[in-house]
Amino acid sequence: MFRTVPKTTLLAPIQRRTLLNGNYPKAYPEHVPLTCLGRAVLAVGSGFGTFFDSRRGDLVATLGEATAQPYFIYKLREQMLKDPTGRRLLREQPRMTSKSLDLDKLRNMKVGSIGRTYVEWLDKEGVSPDTRAQVRYIDDPECAYVMQRYRESHDFYHALTGLPIIMEGELALKAFEWANTGLPMSGLGMVLTPLKFKPKQRKRYFDVYLPWALYNGFRSKPVINVYWEEVLEKDAEELRRDLGIEQPPDLRQMKKDMAKKK
């Protein structure tokens, strides 16, 4: 999710003068200031596009930004401001890329460490931290960083929980993120995407993964405040205990087991 792909014509109307806020100067180089109408059009357009093709990472990212303002992203920033590590993240604003994380170094870390668990998950799923879309539609620069940090931390959440990038795994993680961060885009996916599931997928989701996601998301500490770059050598199971996160059942194995019972 949130990965960059070629720009879509679906969002071309945003370039029209009535949707761009010409009275609002750019707050950072990539910033695209929008009018209220522009933000609404962006949310509706990306929302429909995401529902019909949830693999479109650009639309998922755009929907997240369009629905995070004017309230939810500020609440998430407040969570960071209340935490010493969160405040330091806001002050230092580190970015996570394959270069800054040094993936080759992570591959040589101790088995079971956060760094090793993370890079093994990346290799297994065939993804890279370099494909995260740049935030464009959040007006406040600090809040834009909060959204960027959330976006770049997403694969660490995957690695920590063990959830794969297949649709059921993404949706379970989105439900967890909604319960933990309050960002509405994750909640919308949690509610609407199951409508496209097959009966067995829907049963797994509602019986196992949604209850897991809500329980762990609400009870765990705010994951936005984890300084991942500084805990790479920490044992993954220890960090799960510190955060209050239980791993869900292995989704791919559960699918195999259910297929054998046919």
From Swiss-Prot:
Keywords: Lyase, Membrane, Metal-binding, Mitochondrion, Mitochondrion inner membrane, Ubiquinone biosynthesis, Zinc
Intracellular or extracellular location(s): Mitochondrion inner membrane
Note from the entry: This protein may be expected to contain an N-terminal transit peptide but none has been predicted.
Function per UniProt: Lyase that catalyzes the C1-decarboxylation of 4-hydroxy-3-methoxy-5-(all-trans-polyprenyl)benzoic acid into 2-methoxy-6-(all-trans-polyprenyl)phenol during ubiquinone biosynthesis.
Name this polypeptide is given: Ubiquinone biosynthesis protein COQ4, mitochondrial
Entry similarity comment: Belongs to the COQ4 family.
Cofactor(s) for this UniProt protein: Zn(2+)
One Gene Ontology term, aspect cellular component: mitochondrion
GO biological process, one term: ubiquinone biosynthetic process
Gene that this sequence comes from: COQ4
Binding-site residues for Zn(2+), renumbered to this chain: 154-155, 158, 170
Superkingdom of the source species: Eukaryota
EC number annotated for this UniProt entry: 4.1.1.130
First-listed, main subcellular location of the protein, grouped into a coarse class: mitochondrion
Catalytic activity of the protein: a 4-hydroxy-3-methoxy-5-(all-trans-polyprenyl)benzoate + H(+) = a 2-methoxy-6-(all-trans-polyprenyl)phenol + CO2
Pfam families: Coq4 (PF05019)
InterPro entries named among the record's database cross-references: Coq4, Coq4_euk
Enzyme class: lyase
